[in-house]
């Protein structure tokens, strides 16, 4: 079975896009949408978040390779389509069609039609992909995924001695995505890679304090065993930070 994602392959160019501020009436309508949560279909994870992923904000999920970041992205995308909305998926990691079919199940082909995929090949193209979201965000889009936000950012750091320029560009991308999420009421999910903190010990998410500030919810993923993972609330506006939930990665998704 072949999947027919709506892949975007336009020439990537930076566009100057001005944000449109809402009147108070439009803001009230938008706030009504933002209050709703998007279920992931994974009960432990939804309960940890108070019912699901919050719309109108950026949620960041970080962790080492193989902790389940992309699995969460795919499953949340599938659940969003099942609820009648479209998904924009900015893929810098190489989305596996096989894994998508496993999680989406027998309706994978139909679900794929409601997922618009961008496949940037550089940090600059990633920027253009994020900017493109504004053009179609009003077309019943319920979720925007950026998996991963920092894979190309890592390469940029190699040519940026201080890292200031790269961090600023990354913050601009995610800040713009957050503004669009607020404006249109969709859920925004980004994944992040980690680095070893030689001073404080352990691992920390890439991107610095700016990315942490923009992300209103942050989840840290940890391996706890063969196929089992722990999700820890690193940051949340209304749930206790440090609380955690265990989930399992199965052939059909996360449970």
Tell me what each language-model feature is.
Residues 1-24, 28:
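Short, small/acidic-rich helices and loops at N termini and domain boundaries
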């Amino acid at each position: 079975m072949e999947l027919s994602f709506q892949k975007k392959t336009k020439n990537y160019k930076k566009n100057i896009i001005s944000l449109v501020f809402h009147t108070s009436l439009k803001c009230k309508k938008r706030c009504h949408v933002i209050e709703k949560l998007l279920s992931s279909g994974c009960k432990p994870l939804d309960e940890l978040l108070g019912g699901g992923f919050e719309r109108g904000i950026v949620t960041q999920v970080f962790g080492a390779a193989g902790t389940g970041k992309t699995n969460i992205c795919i499953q949340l995308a599938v659940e969003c389509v099942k609820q009648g909305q479209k998904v924009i998926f900015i893929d810098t990691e190489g989305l596996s069609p096989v894994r998508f079919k496993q999680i989406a199940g027998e309706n994978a082909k139909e679900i794929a039609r409601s997922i618009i995929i961008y496949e940037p090949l550089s940090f600059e193209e990633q920027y253009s992909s994020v900017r493109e979201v504004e053009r179609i965000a009003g077309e019943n889009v319920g979720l925007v995924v950026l998996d991963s936000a920092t894979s190309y950012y890592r390469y940029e750091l190699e040519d940026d001695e201080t890292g200031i320029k790269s961090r600023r560009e990354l913050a601009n991308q995610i800040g713009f995505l957050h503004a669009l999420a607020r404006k249109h009421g969709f859920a925004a999910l980004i994944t992040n890679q980690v680095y070893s903190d030689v001073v404080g010990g352990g691992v920390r998410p890439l991107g610095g304090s700016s990315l942490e500030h923009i992300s209103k919810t942050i989840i840290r993923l940890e391996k706890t065993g063969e196929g089992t993972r722990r999700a820890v609330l690193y940051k949340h506006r209304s749930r206790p930070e440090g609380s955690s939930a265990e989930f399992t990665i199965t052939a059909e998704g996360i449970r």
